Amino acid sequence: MSSHSSPADTPSARKPVTLHTLREMHARGEKIAMITAYDASFAALVDTAGVDCILVGDSLGMVLKGQSSTLSVTMEQIGYHTRSTSRGTKAAFLIADMPFGSYQENPVQALRNAGTLMAAGAQMVKLEGGGWTPETVNFLVERGVPVCAHLGLTPQSVHALGGYRIQGKDEAGAATLRRHAKALADAGAAMMVLELMPSRVAREVQADNPGLMTIGIGAGAGTAGQVLVLHDMLGVTRGRLPRFVRNFMDSATSIEDAVRRYVAAVKDGSFPDETLHAY
Protein backbone atom coordinates (compact mmCIF):
# COMPACT_ATOMS: atom_id res chain seq x y z
CA MET A 1 0.00 0.00 0.00
CA SER A 2 1.33 3.44 -0.86
CA SER A 3 0.26 7.01 -0.20
CA HIS A 4 -0.81 9.12 -3.17
CA SER A 5 0.83 12.25 -1.81
CA SER A 6 4.13 13.11 -0.22
CA PRO A 7 4.61 15.33 2.85
CA ALA A 8 7.21 17.16 0.80
CA ASP A 9 4.42 18.26 -1.57
CA THR A 10 2.45 20.00 1.20
CA PRO A 11 2.16 23.71 0.32
CA SER A 12 3.24 26.36 2.81
CA ALA A 13 1.67 29.82 3.01
CA ARG A 14 4.37 31.07 5.36
CA LYS A 15 7.67 32.61 4.48
CA PRO A 16 10.62 30.48 5.60
CA VAL A 17 11.77 31.19 9.14
CA THR A 18 15.46 32.07 9.22
CA LEU A 19 17.87 32.88 12.01
CA HIS A 20 17.36 36.54 11.12
CA THR A 21 13.58 36.06 11.43
CA LEU A 22 13.99 34.55 14.89
CA ARG A 23 16.24 37.38 16.03
CA GLU A 24 13.69 39.92 14.83
CA MET A 25 10.96 38.07 16.73
CA HIS A 26 13.06 38.08 19.87
CA ALA A 27 13.87 41.77 19.50
CA ARG A 28 10.19 42.69 19.39
CA GLY A 29 9.28 40.36 22.26
CA GLU A 30 7.43 37.70 20.27
CA LYS A 31 7.76 34.26 21.85
CA ILE A 32 9.37 31.45 19.84
CA ALA A 33 7.46 28.14 19.61
CA MET A 34 9.63 25.06 19.06
CA ILE A 35 8.66 21.39 18.96
CA THR A 36 10.37 18.11 18.13
CA ALA A 37 9.73 16.07 14.99
CA TYR A 38 11.58 13.11 13.57
CA ASP A 39 10.06 12.38 10.15
CA ALA A 40 8.63 14.05 7.06
CA SER A 41 4.96 13.47 7.87
CA PHE A 42 5.00 14.97 11.35
CA ALA A 43 7.36 17.73 10.19
CA ALA A 44 4.83 18.76 7.53
CA LEU A 45 2.04 18.68 10.09
CA VAL A 46 3.75 20.82 12.75
CA ASP A 47 5.10 23.13 10.06
CA THR A 48 1.58 23.72 8.75
CA ALA A 49 0.43 24.29 12.34
CA GLY A 50 2.79 27.26 12.58
CA VAL A 51 5.72 26.26 14.78
CA ASP A 52 8.72 28.55 14.41
CA CYS A 53 11.36 25.87 14.95
CA ILE A 54 11.53 22.10 14.63
CA LEU A 55 14.10 20.20 16.67
CA VAL A 56 15.29 16.81 15.49
CA GLY A 57 16.15 15.82 19.04
CA ASP A 58 18.19 12.95 20.35
CA SER A 59 15.04 12.40 22.41
CA LEU A 60 14.22 10.07 19.51
CA GLY A 61 16.22 7.47 21.41
CA MET A 62 13.55 7.46 24.09
CA VAL A 63 10.31 8.27 22.24
CA LEU A 64 10.98 6.29 19.04
CA LYS A 65 13.45 3.60 20.09
CA GLY A 66 12.09 2.99 23.58
CA GLN A 67 15.41 3.42 25.34
CA SER A 68 15.88 4.82 28.84
CA SER A 69 18.20 7.67 27.80
CA THR A 70 19.53 9.52 24.77
CA LEU A 71 23.06 8.17 25.11
CA SER A 72 22.92 5.43 22.46
CA VAL A 73 21.67 7.71 19.67
CA THR A 74 24.20 7.86 16.83
CA MET A 75 25.18 10.36 14.17
CA GLU A 76 23.81 7.99 11.54
CA GLN A 77 20.41 7.99 13.25
CA ILE A 78 20.27 11.77 13.74
CA GLY A 79 21.36 12.25 10.14
CA TYR A 80 18.65 9.90 8.86
CA HIS A 81 15.91 11.63 10.85
CA THR A 82 17.20 15.10 9.94
CA ARG A 83 17.02 14.26 6.24
CA SER A 84 13.52 12.86 6.65
CA THR A 85 12.31 15.82 8.72
CA SER A 86 13.88 18.30 6.32
CA ARG A 87 11.85 16.88 3.43
CA GLY A 88 8.60 17.68 5.22
CA THR A 89 9.62 21.13 6.43
CA LYS A 90 8.77 24.13 4.26
CA ALA A 91 8.86 27.14 6.58
CA ALA A 92 10.02 26.24 10.10
CA PHE A 93 13.66 26.66 11.14
CA LEU A 94 15.26 23.21 11.47
CA ILE A 95 17.64 22.37 14.31
CA ALA A 96 19.42 19.04 14.80
CA ASP A 97 20.84 17.65 18.02
CA MET A 98 24.46 16.56 18.04
CA PRO A 99 24.39 13.16 19.76
CA PHE A 100 26.60 12.06 22.61
CA GLY A 101 30.16 11.43 21.44
CA SER A 102 29.85 13.50 18.26
CA TYR A 103 31.44 16.72 19.56
CA GLN A 104 33.15 16.00 22.88
CA GLU A 105 36.53 14.91 21.48
CA ASN A 106 37.62 18.24 19.99
CA PRO A 107 36.26 21.16 17.92
CA VAL A 108 37.40 19.59 14.64
CA GLN A 109 35.33 16.48 15.35
CA ALA A 110 32.40 18.75 16.19
CA LEU A 111 32.75 20.67 12.92
CA ARG A 112 32.92 17.50 10.85
CA ASN A 113 29.76 16.10 12.42
CA ALA A 114 27.95 19.45 12.39
CA GLY A 115 28.73 19.67 8.68
CA THR A 116 27.11 16.29 8.15
CA LEU A 117 23.92 17.46 9.86
CA MET A 118 23.86 20.75 7.95
CA ALA A 119 24.22 18.80 4.70
CA ALA A 120 21.24 16.69 5.84
CA GLY A 121 19.10 19.83 6.07
CA ALA A 122 19.73 21.29 9.53
CA GLN A 123 20.02 25.08 9.76
CA MET A 124 21.48 24.98 13.27
CA VAL A 125 23.00 22.34 15.53
CA LYS A 126 22.41 21.93 19.25
CA LEU A 127 24.99 20.71 21.73
CA GLU A 128 24.83 20.25 25.48
CA GLY A 129 26.89 21.48 28.40
CA GLY A 130 28.78 24.46 29.78
CA GLY A 131 32.32 24.36 31.13
CA TRP A 132 34.45 23.22 28.23
CA THR A 133 31.94 23.82 25.41
CA PRO A 134 32.40 27.56 24.64
CA GLU A 135 35.61 26.82 22.71
CA THR A 136 33.74 24.35 20.52
CA VAL A 137 30.79 26.73 20.08
CA ASN A 138 33.10 29.53 18.98
CA PHE A 139 34.96 27.21 16.60
CA LEU A 140 31.70 26.25 14.92
CA VAL A 141 30.21 29.75 14.79
CA GLU A 142 33.35 31.24 13.28
CA ARG A 143 33.09 28.65 10.53
CA GLY A 144 29.48 29.41 9.66
CA VAL A 145 27.61 26.88 11.79
CA PRO A 146 24.81 28.43 13.89
CA VAL A 147 24.72 26.90 17.37
CA CYS A 148 22.04 26.33 19.99
CA ALA A 149 23.53 25.62 23.41
CA HIS A 150 21.78 23.59 26.13
CA LEU A 151 22.13 24.10 29.90
CA GLY A 152 20.43 22.89 33.05
CA LEU A 153 19.34 19.28 32.89
CA THR A 154 21.48 17.99 30.02
CA PRO A 155 20.20 14.48 29.20
CA GLN A 156 23.51 13.32 27.73
CA SER A 157 25.04 13.88 31.20
CA VAL A 158 22.24 12.12 33.07
CA HIS A 159 24.60 9.69 34.83
CA ALA A 160 27.02 12.42 35.87
CA LEU A 161 24.11 14.48 37.20
CA GLY A 162 22.70 11.57 39.19
CA GLY A 163 19.46 11.30 37.25
CA TYR A 164 16.83 13.65 35.87
CA ARG A 165 17.00 16.32 38.56
CA ILE A 166 16.25 20.04 38.72
CA GLN A 167 19.47 22.01 38.25
CA GLY A 168 20.47 25.32 39.86
CA LYS A 169 18.27 24.98 42.95
CA ASP A 170 20.90 26.43 45.30
CA GLU A 171 22.82 29.66 44.76
CA ALA A 172 26.07 27.90 43.89
CA GLY A 173 24.35 25.87 41.18
CA ALA A 174 22.48 28.91 39.90
CA ALA A 175 25.71 30.92 39.73
CA THR A 176 27.37 28.14 37.72
CA LEU A 177 24.50 28.10 35.23
CA ARG A 178 24.63 31.88 34.84
CA ARG A 179 28.40 31.79 34.34
CA HIS A 180 28.22 29.02 31.76
CA ALA A 181 25.39 30.77 29.91
CA LYS A 182 27.38 34.01 29.68
CA ALA A 183 30.43 32.16 28.36
CA LEU A 184 28.37 30.35 25.73
CA ALA A 185 26.61 33.54 24.64
CA ASP A 186 29.96 35.32 24.39
CA ALA A 187 31.26 32.40 22.31
CA GLY A 188 28.53 33.04 19.76
CA ALA A 189 25.63 30.73 20.64
CA ALA A 190 22.53 32.33 19.11
CA MET A 191 20.04 30.20 21.01
CA MET A 192 20.07 28.24 24.26
CA VAL A 193 17.74 25.57 25.61
CA LEU A 194 17.28 25.93 29.38
CA GLU A 195 15.95 22.67 30.80
CA LEU A 196 14.60 21.82 34.24
CA MET A 197 15.73 24.77 36.33
CA PRO A 198 13.97 27.26 38.61
CA SER A 199 12.11 30.01 36.75
CA ARG A 200 14.14 32.61 38.61
CA VAL A 201 17.41 31.24 37.24
CA ALA A 202 16.14 31.11 33.66
CA ARG A 203 14.94 34.71 33.93
CA GLU A 204 18.36 35.75 35.20
CA VAL A 205 20.10 33.99 32.31
CA GLN A 206 17.87 35.83 29.82
CA ALA A 207 18.36 39.17 31.60
CA ASP A 208 22.14 38.71 31.66
CA ASN A 209 22.21 37.93 27.92
CA PRO A 210 19.44 40.01 26.29
CA GLY A 211 20.42 39.12 22.72
CA LEU A 212 20.38 35.39 23.43
CA MET A 213 17.24 33.46 22.46
CA THR A 214 16.57 31.25 25.49
CA ILE A 215 14.16 28.37 24.92
CA GLY A 216 12.65 26.89 28.05
CA ILE A 217 11.54 23.37 28.86
CA GLY A 218 10.67 23.17 32.52
CA ALA A 219 12.29 26.58 33.06
CA GLY A 220 9.25 28.82 33.49
CA ALA A 221 7.76 31.57 31.37
CA GLY A 222 10.64 34.04 31.44
CA THR A 223 12.48 32.64 28.43
CA ALA A 224 12.31 33.85 24.83
CA GLY A 225 10.44 30.73 23.79
CA GLN A 226 9.41 27.19 24.67
CA VAL A 227 10.03 23.67 23.41
CA LEU A 228 8.21 20.41 24.06
CA VAL A 229 8.65 16.87 22.81
CA LEU A 230 5.84 16.25 20.32
CA HIS A 231 4.92 12.87 21.77
CA ASP A 232 4.67 14.36 25.28
CA MET A 233 2.35 17.22 24.36
CA LEU A 234 0.10 14.88 22.35
CA GLY A 235 -0.30 12.46 25.26
CA VAL A 236 1.41 9.64 23.36
CA THR A 237 4.21 9.11 25.88
CA ARG A 238 3.32 6.49 28.47
CA GLY A 239 4.08 6.66 32.17
CA ARG A 240 4.56 9.62 34.45
CA LEU A 241 5.38 12.82 32.59
CA PRO A 242 7.38 15.77 33.97
CA ARG A 243 5.45 18.58 35.60
CA PHE A 244 6.29 20.97 32.77
CA VAL A 245 4.39 18.95 30.14
CA ARG A 246 0.87 19.93 29.12
CA ASN A 247 -1.31 17.60 27.05
CA PHE A 248 -2.63 19.81 24.24
CA MET A 249 -4.66 16.95 22.74
CA ASP A 250 -7.11 17.08 25.65
CA SER A 251 -9.25 19.76 24.04
CA ALA A 252 -8.07 19.46 20.43
CA THR A 253 -9.95 18.09 17.44
CA SER A 254 -6.83 16.81 15.67
CA ILE A 255 -3.06 16.59 16.04
CA GLU A 256 -2.66 19.71 13.91
CA ASP A 257 -5.17 21.53 16.11
CA ALA A 258 -3.25 20.45 19.22
CA VAL A 259 -0.02 21.87 17.81
CA ARG A 260 -1.79 25.09 16.81
CA ARG A 261 -3.07 25.39 20.39
CA TYR A 262 0.47 24.88 21.68
CA VAL A 263 1.84 27.58 19.37
CA ALA A 264 -0.92 29.99 20.40
CA ALA A 265 -0.36 29.29 24.11
CA VAL A 266 3.37 29.95 23.79
CA LYS A 267 2.74 33.14 21.82
CA ASP A 268 0.16 34.56 24.25
CA GLY A 269 2.10 33.54 27.34
CA SER A 270 -0.51 31.16 28.76
CA PHE A 271 1.97 28.28 28.48
CA PRO A 272 3.83 27.56 30.59
CA ASP A 273 1.67 28.44 33.59
CA GLU A 274 4.06 29.32 36.42
CA THR A 275 1.72 27.71 38.95
CA LEU A 276 1.45 24.40 37.06
CA HIS A 277 4.44 23.87 34.79
CA ALA A 278 7.38 25.60 36.50
CA TYR A 279 9.74 25.04 39.42
Swiss-Prot record:
The keyword Metal-binding applies. 3-methyl-2-oxobutanoate binds at residues 58-59, 97, 126. InterPro entries: Pantoate_hydroxy_MeTrfase, Pyrv/PenolPyrv_kinase-like_dom, Pyrv_kinase-like_dom_sf. Belongs to the PanB family. HAMAP family: PanB. Catalyzes the reversible reaction in which hydroxymethyl group from 5,10-methylenetetrahydrofolate is transferred onto alpha-ketoisovalerate to form ketopantoate. This is 3-methyl-2-oxobutanoate hydroxymethyltransferase 2.
